[in-house]
C-alpha cells in the first residue's frame, strides 16, 4: 500500500479535513505566485499569495492586494475556483467528481460527506450532495444573469466575467470583488450603493448561501409548511430574519441619514446582510459610529448557519445560548424552542464554540494591536472578520506586517474548518477517563 494511503487510513475525519483544506490552500498559493497570475506578469511574494489563497478557500474576502487591479484573468479564475471549492467544501466538491465519473461512494466517504453537510444521518447523503451541487450552480447562474445587464452596461463584454465572478463570490459568502482600479483599490461595491439590482441580487445570494444546505432540502421537501420543518431549519430561518430586520432598522434610523429614502434603505439592508458573512460593502465602514461598528462586529461574530457557505459561530449556536439563558431565568432544566427541548450536548458545544471564537478573536486583536501599535477596537474588527470568514475591513489588513497577517491567516483557517474540528483533530489520540469524579457545588454569577 502506498505511503499516502497508509497515512490516509490513520487519519480521522477531522484531521483529513484540515489536511485537505491546507493542501488546496498551498496549491492555490503556488498558482498565485506564478507571474501569469499577476497583471504585470511579476512574481507575487509567497506570503501575499498564501494570504490571498487562504482568504479565498476560507471564503473570507480579506485581501492584501486589490483583486481587480493586481491579479490577471488567470489569477482571478484561480481565485474563483478556490472560492467555489471553499464555499461548497473540499469533500462535497470531491464527492461531486466521484458522482460525475460514476464511481461508487464508499461507506467511509458517505460518513465524511455527512459530517461536511452537517446532516443528521448517512442515509440519503449522496442524493443530498447531488442536490446541493445542482442547486448551487443553478443559483449562481441565476445571480449572474440578474447582474449581467448592469455590469455589461458599465464594463462592456468584460461585464460577463464580473457578473459570474461576483455571483460565485456572493453565493459562497466570500466577498471578493473586481471593482478596484490602480488609482482606487479596495472599493468593493460602493459605486452601486443605490443600484437596486446589484444590492438585492448580492444580498439574496448571500442569504441563500448562508442558510445551509439542509434548510434548502427542508424547504424543497415541505414547501412553505413551516410547522413541518426540522427544528434546526425553524431556528435558522427565524434567526436569519431577525438578524436582517433588526440591524436594517438600526442602520436606517441611526447611521445612514443622507441621500434618498431608497438609497438609505438599500444601504441599511446591505450592511445588515453582508457581515454574515460575505465581506462586500456599499458603505465606508470607517465612517460608521462606534455603535455601528460594534453591531457589525456582533453580526460578523454570529455569522451564518451550519452546513452552509458562511462562517461565524453560527445562528444556531447563538440561538441555543439565548434559549439556554432564558431557561436559566425560568429555572427550567433544559432550553426549549418551537415546542422542542434542546439536547444537553448542543448547549455544551455552543458554549465551547462561543468561548473558543471569543478567546481567539480577542487574543489575535491584542497581539496585532501590540505589534502594529494600532487601536484595539480596529484590530478586533479585523480579527473578528477573519475568524468569522467575513472579509470586511477598516483598511488595516493590506498594511499589516507578516506576523499580523500570519495571525489573520490562522484565524481564517480556524474559522473555515471549524474551531471544534481543530480541537478534535488535535486531541484525537487522547482518551477520556471513564471514572466519575466527586461533584461539588460552585457559585457563579
Language model feature labels by segment:
Residues 1-445:
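Membrane-proximal intracellular helices of multi-pass ion channels
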Amino acid at each position: 500500500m502506498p505511503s499516502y494511503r497508509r497515512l490516509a487510513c490513520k487519519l480521522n475525519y477531522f484531521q483529513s479535513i484540515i489536511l485537505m483544506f491546507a493542501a488546496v490552500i498551498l496549491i492555490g498559493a503556488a498558482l498565485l505566485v506564478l507571474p501569469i497570475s499577476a497583471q504585470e506578469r511579476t512574481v507575487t511574494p509567497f506570503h501575499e499569495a498564501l494570504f490571498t489563497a487562504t482568504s479565498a478557500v476560507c471564503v473570507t474576502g480579506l485581501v492584501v492586494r486589490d483583486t481587480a487591479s493586481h491579479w490577471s484573468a488567470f489569477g482571478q479564475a484561480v481565485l474563483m475556483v478556490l472560492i467555489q471549492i471553499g464555499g461548497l467544501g473540499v469533500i462535497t466538491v470531491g464527492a461531486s467528481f466521484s458522482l460525475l465519473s460514476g464511481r461508487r461512494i464508499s461507506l467511509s466517504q458517505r460518513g465524511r460527506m455527512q459530517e461536511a453537510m452537517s446532516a443528521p444521518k448517512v442515509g440519503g447523503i449522496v442524493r443530498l450532495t447531488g442536490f446541493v451541487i445542482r442547486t448551487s450552480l443553478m443559483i449562481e447562474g441565476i445571480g449572474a444573469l440578474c447582474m449581467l445587464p448592469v455590469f455589461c452596461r458599465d464594463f462592456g463584454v468584460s461585464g460577463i466575467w464580473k457578473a459570474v465572478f461576483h455571483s460565485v463570490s456572493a453565493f459562497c459568502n466570500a466577498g471578493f470583488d473586481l471593482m478596484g482600479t490602480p488609482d482606487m483599490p479596495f472599493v468593493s461595491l460602493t459605486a452601486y450603493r443605490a443600484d437596486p439590482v446589484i444590492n438585492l441580487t448580492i444580498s439574496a445570494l448571500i442569504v441563500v448561501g448562508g442558510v445551509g444546505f439542509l434548510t434548502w432540502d427542508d424547504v424543497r421537501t415541505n414547501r412553505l409548511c413551516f410547522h413541518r420543518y426540522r427544528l434546526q431549519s425553524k431556528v435558522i430561518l427565524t434567526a436569519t430574519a431577525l438578524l436582517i430586520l433588526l440591524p436594517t432598522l438600526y442602520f436606517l434610523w441611526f447611521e445612514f441619514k443622507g441621500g434618498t429614502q431608497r438609497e438609505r434603505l438599500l444601504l441599511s439592508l446591505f450592511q445588515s446582510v453582508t457581515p454574515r458573512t460575505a465581506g462586500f460593502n456599499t458603505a465606508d465602514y470607517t465612517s460608521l459610529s462606534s455603535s455601528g461598528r460594534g453591531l457589525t462586529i456582533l453580526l460578523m461574530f454570529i455569522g451564518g448557519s451550519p452546513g452552509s457557505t458562511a462562517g461565524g459561530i453560527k445562528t444556531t449556536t447563538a440561538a441555543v445560548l439565548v434559549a439556554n439563558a432564558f431557561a436559566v431565568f425560568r429555572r427550567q432544566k433544559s432550553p426549549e424552542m418551537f415546542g422542542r427541548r434542546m439536547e444537553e450536548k448542543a448547549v455544551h458545544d455552543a458554549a465551547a464554540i462561543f468561548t473558543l471564537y471569543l478567546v481567539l478573536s480577542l487574543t489575535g486583536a491584542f497581539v496585532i494591536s501590540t505589534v502594529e501599535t494600532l487601536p484595539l477596537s480596529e484590530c478586533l474588527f479585523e480579527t473578528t472578520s477573519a475568524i468569522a470568514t467575513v472579509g470586511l475591513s477598516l483598511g488595516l489588513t493590506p498594511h499589516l506586517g507578516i506576523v499580523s497577517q500570519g495571525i489573520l491567516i490562522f484565524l481564517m483557517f480556524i474559522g473555515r474548518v471549524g474551531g471544534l474540528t481543530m480541537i478534535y483533530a488535535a486531541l484525537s489520540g487522547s482518551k477520556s477517563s471513564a471514572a466519575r469524579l466527586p461533584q461539588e457545588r460552585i457559585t457563579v454569577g
